[in-house]
UniProtKB/Swiss-Prot annotation:
Entry protein name: Phosphoglycerate kinase
Pathway: Carbohydrate degradation; glycolysis; pyruvate from D-glyceraldehyde 3-phosphate: step 2/5
Family classification: Belongs to the phosphoglycerate kinase family.
Residue sites binding ATP per the record: 202, 324, 354-357
Organism: Cereibacter sphaeroides (strain KD131 / KCTC 12085) (Rhodobacter sphaeroides)
Length: 397
């Protein structure tokens, strides 16, 4: 591992600046899902146990360098206090300057301080060295626990990390270890499942994966584009016909790299995209001209079952069908439950990420069974694309 963790740092009596992700959904000024807040608790508690004083830095929404009251982190304070019962959590109405400096000076051991939205300063998203230096003045150690913001080179994620002794927080550490196990030095064979609507949004991902995995399963709307590239008609299905040449390039790149690509063998088609729509299962080559492909069929699921059973590592990003609408969630559900089963039996290391993916695995009741579920979205995708993440690179020893 090329980065320090909390275990490597002497925090006793030190002010620890912790970059966290508390970008939670709100309704009428109330937090509707506190998952991201709950995930930072182990890091905050470990810093407190080591005698450090945690000062939390975070962004909230997109205020574009201006103060926007509805995007004040003050709104998150009650949910944060609830997640840390028995710990006094205070708030400072800025993240640099006299107000946070005084609030930090007044902190007692065992207390936590939340600073105002870093994006209220235009310099945050520009990675302004002056803003990073003003933040660095507040503490002696920097901890990044926001993997989800690590793909952005901002003042609080990258600039600050280069000015103070730095380490990964517990959530960041867990994420990096899981991704290292899945793509860095994985146990082989490695299977990647990539679904979703469009090839165009996942070009870099597919291009990187064919050179790094043994099997690539392509599902969802993007599978239709690959079928079109092979001369198969897909009726009224979602397909990016202008991406057919690109799909053929990916297929030949995979062949050259010894990566087997798995496309649907049979498909579930319907004439309407709605819950409970009349549907039928047909061979992939037999999609009626007036129908659309909305899921992979049982033959495909059975074939994938064999691929999964032979694998040691699996990475999943994107559903295999239109999982939001029953019965077109069947292939995603069946595949996800099998991965969870193999993982629980100790036969597979499974890592999944991306918004739709997490929703699909939760819907299938399979999320708990995976080795690791990343909530990072864009950062998870960029890591899978093989890109260097500035927030992680800045922590590298």
């Amino acid at each position: 591992m090329g980065w320090k963790t909390l275990d490597d740092m002497d925090l006793a009596g030190k002010v620890v600046l912790v970059r966290v992700d508390v970008n939670v959904p709100m309704e009428n000024g109330e937090v509707t899902d506190a998952t991201r807040i709950e995930k930072i608790v182990p890091t905050v508690e470990d810093i407190l146990k080591k005698g450090g004083k945690p000062v939390l830095l975070a962004h909230f929404g997109r205020p574009k360098g201006k103060v926007v009251e509805e995007m004040s982190l003050r709104l998150v304070l009650p949910a944060l206090q609830k997640a840390l019962p028995g710990t006094k959590v205070s708030f400072a109405a800025d993240c640099v300057g006299p107000e946070p400096e005084q609030a930090v000076a007044a902190m007692l051991e065992g207390e936590v301080l939340l600073l105002e939205n870093t994006r209220f300063h235009a310099g945050e998203e520009k990675n302004d060295p002056e803003l990073a230096a003003a933040m660095a003045k507040l503490g002696q150690v920097y901890v990044n626990d926001a993997f989800s913001a690590a793909h952005r080179a901002h003042a609080s994620t990258e600039g600050l990390a280069r000015l103070l002794p730095s380490a990964a927080g517990r959530l960041m550490e867990a994420e990096l270890k899981a991704l290292e196990a899945a793509l860095g030095h994985p146990e082989r064979p490695v299977v990647a499942v990539v679904g979703g609507a469009k090839v165009s949004t996942k070009l870099d991902l597919l291009g990187n994966l064919v050179g790094r995995v043994d099997h690539l399963v392509i599902g969802g709307g993007m599978a239709n584009t690959f079928l079109v590239a092979q001369g198969i008609e897909v009726g009224k299905s979602l397909a990016e016909r202008d991406m057919a040449d690109t799909a053929r390039e990916i297929l030949s790149k995979a062949k050259a790299a010894g990566c087997t690509i798995h496309l649907p063998l049979d498909v579930v088609v319907a004439r309407e995209f709605k819950a409970g729509a009349a549907n039928e299962t047909v061979e992939t080559s037999a999609c009626p001209a007036d129908a659309m492909i909305l899921d992979a069929g049982p033959k495909t699921v059975a074939a994938l079952s064999e691929v999964f059973a032979s694998a040691k590592t699996l990475i999943w990003n994107g559903p295999l069908g239109a999982f939001e609408i029953e019965p077109f969630d069947a292939a995603t559900n069946a595949a996800a439950l099998q991965v969870a089963q193999l993982t629980k039996a100790g036969q597979l290391i499974s890592v999944a990420g991306g918004g739709d993916t997490v929703a699909a695995l939760n819907k299938a009741g399979a999320a708990e069974g995976f080795s690791y579920i990343s909530t990072a979205g864009g950062a998870f995708l960029e890591w899978m694309e093989g890109k260097e993440l500035p927030g992680v690179a800045a922590l590298t020893v």
